[in-house]
């Protein structure tokens, strides 16, 4: 999640929540569509699969603060507790908008049905965000530093079809 504004953050958070819900619970995906009223005109149904679709562009989010509020309202009404993991969380400190840390902290504090995982590659910024008394997220999370995963522990499974699909592999018959 390498975002540069609240609008991008809100868009990606909403998209990821929706795409995670869709295969798991049609009822909750529909509730999400009904809850996010500020961009509701961009939700629809795929006539072929008869599944809801999430077709929103970044420019469609005119008031990201309002849309973010709707997303957190949805999370608070979800039928099961949610785990929200945000990678590269330190990016919010670089947004041009003011007080984003305080805005998110307020939403997260009020969110009784969700648990949050904050991850970031810039350790000093993460440390400052959660350990400085002058910052909104002060003492709001347990800090855990993860070391790099050894290369031999990582396995990749990539099919030839997927490589062809992305253009990374060309097959020619001569």
Protein language model regions, located:
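Conserved nucleotide-binding/hydrolysis micro-motifs of P-loop NTPases
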Residues: 2-6, 91, 121-126, 149-152
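Short glycine-/polar-rich loops that comprise or flank the Walker A/P-loop
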Residues: 112-114, 139-142
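Short regulatory helix/loop adjacent to the ATP-binding pocket of P-loop NTPases
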Residues: 123-141, 159
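Conserved small helical "lid"/interfacial subdomain of P-loop NTPases
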Residues: 146-173
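Conserved Walker B catalytic segment
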Residues: 54-122, 131
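Short, glycine/charged-enriched secondary-structure capping and boundary segments
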Residues: 11-14, 98-101, 131-135, 160
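P-loop NTPase nucleotide-binding core
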Residues: 1-83
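Conserved beta-strand scaffold positions in the cores of enzyme catalytic domains, especially
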Residues: 1, 143-145
């Amino acid at each position: 999640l390498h975002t540069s504004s609240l609008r991008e953050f809100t868009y990606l958070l909403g998209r990821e929540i929706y795409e995670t819900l869709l295969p798991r619970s049609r009822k909750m995906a529909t509730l999400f569509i009904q809850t996010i009223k500020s961009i509701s005109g961009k939700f629809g149904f795929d006539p072929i699969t008869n599944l809801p679709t999430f077709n929103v562009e970044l420019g469609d989010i005119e008031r990201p603060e309002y849309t973010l509020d709707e997303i957190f309202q949805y999370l608070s009404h979800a039928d099961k507790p949610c785990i929200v993991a945000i990678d590269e969380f330190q990016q919010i400190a670089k947004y041009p908008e003011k007080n984003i840390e305080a805005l998110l902290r307020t939403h997260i504090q009020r969110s009784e049905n969700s648990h949050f995982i904050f991850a970031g590659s810039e350790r000093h910024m993460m440390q400052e965000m959660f350990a400085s008394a002058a910052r909104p997220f002060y003492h709001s999370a347990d800090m855990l530093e993860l070391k790099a995963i050894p290369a031999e522990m990582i396995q990749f499974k990539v099919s030839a079809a997927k490589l062809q699909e992305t253009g990374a592999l060309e097959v020619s018959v001569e």
